[in-house]
């Protein structure tokens, strides 16, 4: 019951066929990402403010306040005791602002004590032939948002208090602020410049 409404699963159907008195399993082994792609192409589920208020224990006034703050500041922190549904509410807040359940415009990560700039922005990762400069999850998501300026994107960080913000964000810590969106900074591991797009909300 605790997982109701939180997980979406695509079950693999298993059928059996009788042959020479033996049962041979006929198993659909299509990769999960194929199902995910089919679902994203064939089913667009609308999601409204009313849907949010029906799923999240929050008043309409509080919802309107959250929306106004997020649109104005670009960044929003939800604070509360563990297990009260902050992450659940954050994702559905994003859904309601997008207007549909479009997970391609939402990214979710969880910070921990060992999370680093190399994981988040950019860094060298071990490969078979040595080390390779690899883009982190925040960098990639920002690039996606920058390529589609007509759409809003939402980056959700769970357990943000467990991470070392200065260590993880590095020179980009200031760039997530509203007044510095679009301002370019040179990345530590490359000579390229980078900015946090204005259509990305955190």
Explain the meaning of each model-derived region.
Residues 35-202:
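AAA+ P-loop NTPase catalytic core and its hallmark functional loops
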Residues 3-49:
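Contiguous surface segments at macromolecular interaction interfaces
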């Amino acid at each position: 019951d605790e997982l109701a409404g939180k997980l979406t699963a695509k079950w693999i159907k298993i059928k059996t066929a009788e042959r020479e008195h033996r049962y041979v399993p006929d198993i659909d082994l299509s990769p999960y990402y194929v199902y995910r792609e089919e679902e994203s192409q064939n089913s667009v589920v609308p999601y409204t403010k009313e849907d949010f208020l029906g799923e999240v224990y929050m008043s309409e006034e509080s919802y309107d306040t959250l929306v106004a703050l997020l649109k104005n500041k670009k960044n929003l922190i939800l604070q509360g005791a563990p297990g009260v549904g902050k992450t659940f509410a954050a994702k559905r807040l994003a859904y309601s602002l997008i207007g549909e359940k479009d997970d391609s415009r939402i990214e979710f990560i969880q910070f921990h004590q060992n999370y680093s700039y190399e994981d988040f922005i950019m860094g060298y990762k071990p490969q078979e032939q040595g080390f390779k400069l690899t883009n982190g999850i925040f960098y990639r998501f920002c690039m996606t948002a920058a390529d589609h300026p007509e759409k809003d994107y939402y980056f959700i960080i769970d357990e943000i208090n467990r991470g070392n913000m200065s260590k993880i964000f590095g020179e980009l810590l200031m760039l997530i602020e509203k007044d510095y969106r679009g301002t370019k900074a040179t990345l530590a591991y490359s000579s390229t410049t980078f900015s946090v797009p204005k259509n990305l909300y955190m």
